[in-house]
Amino acid sequence: MIKNVAYLKKVFSKLVAVIISALSILLSVITFIFPNLTENWECCIIGKVFILVLCFAGLFLIIFFISLIATKLKRKNTIWQKGCRSVTIVYDDIFKLKSKKKDSKKKYIVIPVDTQFMTQVDEDTFKVKNPCVSINTLHGKFIKQFYETESKVAALDSEISEYISLKGYQPDSAQMAKYQNSSKNRYEIGTVVEVQPTNDSHFLLLAVSEFDENNNAHSSKEFLVKSLVSLLEFYNKNCQGNDLYIPLIGTSLSRIELSDEQSLQIIRATIEQNLNYVHGNVNIVVYEKNRSSVSIF
C-alpha cells in the first residue's frame, strides 16, 4: 500500500509540473497579447487572489483524481527489459489468463505443488482419510477447476507419470529415505511437470513443498528459491521464449508463511539474479483482488 501511495505521489508530481508549466506559458502568452491587462491590478488584488486560490484548489482536486485513476488503472510494472525479453509484475488472476484474447505466444502458468505431485483434494476433512491437497490452495483450485471428476483426476495422474518418465526424473533418495512409508515416489524440490488440461492451456507444476507421513506440508524460503531457479532453468530449455506466469508462492496456507509482499520480493530478487535464463516474457502475478495488501510498483 505504501508503494501505491508513492506511485500516486510520483504521478501527481508529474501532473502538477506539467500543468503549472502550461499555465505559466499561457499567462505569458496572454500578457504578450494583452499588455494593458495588468494596469489596474492593484484595484482588484483581493478578488484576483481569491480567484487564484479557487483555481489552484480546483486544479489540485483534478490532478489528485487523475493521479488516483491512473494508479488504479495501471495493472503492470515492467521492472526489466532487454529486446524481446522482459520481467513484469502484474495484477491478474492466473486462472483467467488462458481465456483472454489469444496471441501468437503460449502462456505457461506455474502452479506450486508438493514433491509427490498429489492429486487428492481435501474438500471435507471428515470424509477424506489423510487429506492431501487443500481446496484453498492454488494446487487444489487448479485440480478442482480442470479435473473435477475421478476419471479426470486419474487422467491427470497418468499425464504426470508419463511426463516424469519422458523426462527421466528419478525419485529423490533423501526424501524416500526420510519418508519410508510413502505411497508415491517423491521428487526433488524444483522438479517441473508440464500438463495440458485443455488445448489452449499449459500449466507447469512446480514442486516447492514436502508432505510428511501425516500429510502436513513442509517448505522453506530455501526451498522456494531453489524451486524458482529450477523453474527458470526449465523455462529457458523447454518453453521456446513463450510467456511465463508465476503466482506469489509461499503465502496463505503455505508453511513458509510469507506475506504477499515478502513472496513478491523473493520471487523478484531470484529472477533478477538469474536473468540469463529469461528468454521471453516472465510475469510475476499478484492476485488482482490483493491490490490493497501488495504493490507492484
State where each predicted segment sits:
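Macrodomain-like recognition of ADP-ribose-binding/processing modules
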Residues: 2-297
